[in-house]
Amino acid sequence: MSGAVQNRRMDDIVKQAMIKWPNVPDCYGWLGLDARGRWFIRDQATQASGDFPAQKGSELRHEKLLDFVARNYESDAKGQWYFQNGPQRVYVELECTPWIWRMEPDGSIRSHTGEKVTALRCLVDEAGKVYLVTELGFGLLQSQDVGMAALQIESGLWMPESVATSDLESMFGFERSPQVRQRGAQLQQPHAQGV
């Protein structure tokens, strides 16, 4: 279960660019999503300094750009999440999970992209982090909202299941670091001249 819901909101201009320029190379390492649902741009200097999240980069704060990223965020068949930037896929480095959930005071839940969701399952790891499975997929409840989650659990609305952090990617079919996967794939390819 990758939690991949094909983005019904993808911008028409993005879809048109994908058709017009189908062979634009994918981009790795330039965008990160932290455990609080914040987006980070990672330039070459940041990437050279280390992997995400140790080297986060510059937080995106421009509202229209944040909305554009949110509308064009989805995953591929390998569980790698990306932002479709016109004809180019910009793969996202995840600090934790592909979705970050935020609770409102009334108990409602929203994704880091602003979509209202319903908790279908609740999981808690060995560190006490709370994860939810929703109709959009699997994600972490941001740490600021764990107190509100405790109320949901105490009232019996959520029945938490134990989960090991090390099992999350395989259980829910997502890739935290498409960049690391890409590096590994490049190392395994035979060199054209050496074959």
Where are the language model's segments positioned?
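Long alpha-helical, hydrophobic tracts
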Residues: G3-E63
